[in-house]
Amino acid sequence: MPTPPKVKSSASIVGEPHDVLELFERRIEWAERFGAHHGGAKHHEAGSSEEGQIAVVGGNAAAAGQDTLTTGLVQNFAADKDGYSIIVGDAIFEASAQSPEPGGATATASTFLAVSGADFIIEYESSHGGLGPNDAWASSELYYVALDIKGWSPGGGPVVIELHQPGHHFQPSGHQPSDGNYAHVIARAESHGADNLSATLTNALTIENQFSFVNAIGVVAV
């Protein structure tokens, strides 16, 4: 399965702000070229209503054991331009746990995406995990682009391109969290346009010597 270009490694939970903006600008430039190329395609009939785009991206991570760590990052950005609107986003969640008792460590991570009103959706998703006698880890990451070309729609409905890596692989992991129980989560959402919406929700919970949990969502509409 080919890996999409310039995806960020899940090892870095928080990237520098200018990196995010540069990625957003590159995808905007791609959308402008793409929208111009398809300008002469099939159009809606005159008088038909135009609906905007809305996208929700998020995920969660949980770890159980004496020492646990969960991290989450959600980013969602939207812009309404002349002739098209575009939304880009990602979600990266990781969990790791360690226990002195064999089989006492568990870890899970997952991501999700829901998009409405887009003509084209490109989504890349990957999940992995490891399980050893005294430790466990899991990671899940998702990247996507959603594009709506105003006054045009694909004849057969939205075009969705999904790129996936194989599912979880459980094997001795070697991942060891720091002593203690930690939970870190960040969510960012931003939208630009005449009628727009952006919102985020985050939760983080730790229980000493037992558990760590994070979840987050980012919502944008244009």
Place the predicted regions along the sequence by residue:
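Low-complexity repeat regions of mature extracellularly deployed or surface/particle-associated proteins
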Residues: 2-222
